[in-house]
Amino acid sequence: VMNEIEATQMEQIKKVAEVMADCIQSGHLVHTFGCGHANLPIEEMYPRIGGIVGFHPLCELPLTFFTHIVGEMGINQFLWLEREEGYGQAIMQSWNFDKNDLLWIFSHTGVNAVNIDVANEAHKRGMKVIVCGSAGRTGDKKPRHSGGKNLFQIADYVVDTCCPLQDASVTLKNHFDKIGPLSTMASITCVWMIITTVCEILADRGMKLHINPSHNIPGDTTARERLAA
């Protein structure tokens, strides 16, 4: 999967990085959204050692915390919420955006209503939408949304994570379902390929980046000061 990303997505990664660099340099934010395990790339990028100011997580707890299969915050509630039209609109109403901000969404299949609603609301506010997901394998799937288009079809920019449709990758004897999902690894790979490119572009332009430093380096006594700055 990583080899395929490198072989097929570098041009698109550079294009997306330029768009994000322009956004951050102009003093605006790249907002990030995902639900389920697609929230993990968001947690990975910021706040994080080596991450930069400019990326703003939109983390909705009922869509990101579902370690209980049954009971409160269970998988049944999560599956209902991510497929329910209107929830994404309510999420977006809770934030203030600028038309020059960007929205970066992570979704393996791009079919669930909450992601589509969030993207549509971003467009209504004048924002461009970037999507990371398995567009090549799932890009023609019918959405769970009355609008008739999936997330990849309404995005302004798409970076393909090159994962299989089922996500899981390893077949077991006497079992129908596979194990070993790939989408989280692939999405995080795309995250850092994009963000490191963004940082290189901004550094080449002479912009001072606010980088989250490590606080665990022996002898480094200025990490807190650099963080506060």
Language-model segment annotations:
Residues T8-Q25, I91:
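A short, well-structured juxtamembrane/interface segment
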Residues Q9, E225-A228:
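NAD(P)-dependent dehydrogenase/reductase Rossmann-like domain
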